């Protein structure tokens, strides 16, 4: 009885890992986000937040890193005025914590995330550089991330490769705690 379910799970993992390779993928030779996120018209807010928190050095020099980058539309849906409040605050610790929750140490391509989920019976957990857990599971063909308070974000563009990292665009802002 156990063998058929194992075969089904392994087959599903194989098929899902193949589907990731069909997604759009970009490669940049520069280091991570500060030069390349701004190239995307839909990542202006996260670039502004990186500059405001002075996290450019971390992103340009550290690595390997995985960044789950919310689109501008995701930030706009996040909260009316909250992003502006965080960007304009003198104390940038809350904004820095929020950004840190979107970064995981290590080079996690979509296929590595899928393999971790296969090993975890459909679920995987990663520790962000902020120190909190970020869970991943599948919903159809999508990798879905879940934060500690239950918010979810889908990876909409996977494996934007950088010299020292990989970026996955997500459709929602995830949070380490309620803001």
Where in this protein do the model-derived segments appear?
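Mature, structured domains of secreted/extracytosolic soluble proteins
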Residues: 2, 20-179
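Bacterial N-terminal signal peptides that target proteins for export
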Residues: 1-10
């Amino acid at each position: 009885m156990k063998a058929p379910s194992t075969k089904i799970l392994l087959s599903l993992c194989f098929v899902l890992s193949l589907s990731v390779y069909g997604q759009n993928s970009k490669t940049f030779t520069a280091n991570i986000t500060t030069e390349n996120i701004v190239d995307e018209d839909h990542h202006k807010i996260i670039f502004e937040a990186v500059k405001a928190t002075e996290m450019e050095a971390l992103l340009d020099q550290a690595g390997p890193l995985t960044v789950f980058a919310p689109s501008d539309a995701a930030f706009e849906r996040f909260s009316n005025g909250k992003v502006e409040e965080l960007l304009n605050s003198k104390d940038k610790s809350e904004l820095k914590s929020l950004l840190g929750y979107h970064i995981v140490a290590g080079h996690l391509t979509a296929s590595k995330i899928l393999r971790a989920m296969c090993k975890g019976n459909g679920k995987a957990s990663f520790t962000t550089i902020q120190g909190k857990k970020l869970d991943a599971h599948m919903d159809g063909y999508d990798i879905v991330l879940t934060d500690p308070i239950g918010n979810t974000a889908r990876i909409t563009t996977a494996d934007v490769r950088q010299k020292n990292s990989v970026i996955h665009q997500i459709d929602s802002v995830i949070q380490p705690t309620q803001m």
